[in-house]
């Protein structure tokens, strides 16, 4: 790789690619000004010419840059570089480099997660959400792949990639063929294409808690459409029917978070967090 592609802004040296998502690549990089390792999320070059994706990426940067909380992956800097081949502007975000594993990796490892640990993980997520919701930002994409378990055992939520200020939630999100958000953690109102608020994050956290407790999400299917339909129409089985170690109190919190009607869920992340702490 040439020098023009391994350096960003004469400050960040890209070292190793550590992740690829639907719209971006994540690199481990060295910040030569401050002498530290960081993570750089860079829009995929093949998407850089797409103004819709560029706007989405910039929105991510603006949303995340204002969030400063121990349970949220910190955003340090944003910028833009020119791709030497296409000469298109390629936006990037510089973030805290977190050592650890995503909860998706933890779940795929196959080892049973103790119910008490599942509750602790979700308390960390809800701490992050209480903070972002107070700032007017709905995450919209809470799922195991977006939650990091650090080496010291703390939780960090990342990738506010489709987060928007609540004031913007009436905007349509049907520009792309794929439903934005992951089907297994999609709230019924998102599945129907309706306006969402912080209670969509409560629902997704309920899906996450369910999967951490029993090893699979509340709804599975052959296609995203079939899963989305279940979110809208089907009642999930109580987690305790799949794992006898799950207590009635755990069932109650999980199923309240998974209520079809947002009015029947926890109204705030703080209230769901308190219910988990009191179990």
Which residues are covered by each model-predicted region?
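Eukaryotic protein kinase
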Residues: 1-277
